[in-house]
Amino acid sequence: GKFVSITKSVTIYYPHEYLKGVEVVDTPGFNDPIVSREERTKEFLKKADVVIMMLYAGRPFDATDRDIIFKNVRQCGIGKVLVGINKYDIPYCSETNPEDENQIKEYVKTEIKKACRECNDNTLVEILSDVEPIPLSAEMALLSELPMSKISSSEAWNFAWKRYCSNFGISSQAEMYKWSHLDNFVSAVKSMVENEKNKILFAK
């Protein structure tokens, strides 16, 4: 928005029991045209116990993603990596070469294993060896929560709603949420927080 140029950070609190003592940071990412943002990302990574890496399903785990993990994440002492594959609907609904969720996931797992074989960092290889990528659609999840009146009044939202309904045979917001697979991602985050926090901290 209009305040991006003067905003250093935004803090949001969410009173959920399993998030007690947990801080989630949405970093600017890498390859940002503003160098200072990339430097801030590296600083945050040095303090992080877990990295949530969100890939784009249109080109999952490409050379850029590989560089992020093997050139940046490996230097920061990360205890765990959680991989999401956003916009899984793009290859899923491809007219020329459609792929289901399992095919998308297996492709990313194969690429990660291939990259691991080329890496000499045993610690990072161990961290990535049990990664289970999770396909999801953040836009479908958002559409499942927005008021239908808002969706109907927006040309962009209405177009997206109709496209998903047509491609997935969806007729309600409950079905839209189910097909978003956001629950799978939330469950993975929750499991990591509740079951592996001590193990991650001990490993570091």
Task: Indicate residue ranges for each PLM-predicted region.
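Globular "head" domains of long coiled-coil molecular machines
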Residues: 1-197
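Mixed-charge, glycine-rich, non-catalytic linkers/tails in nucleic-acid processing enzymes
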Residues: 200-204
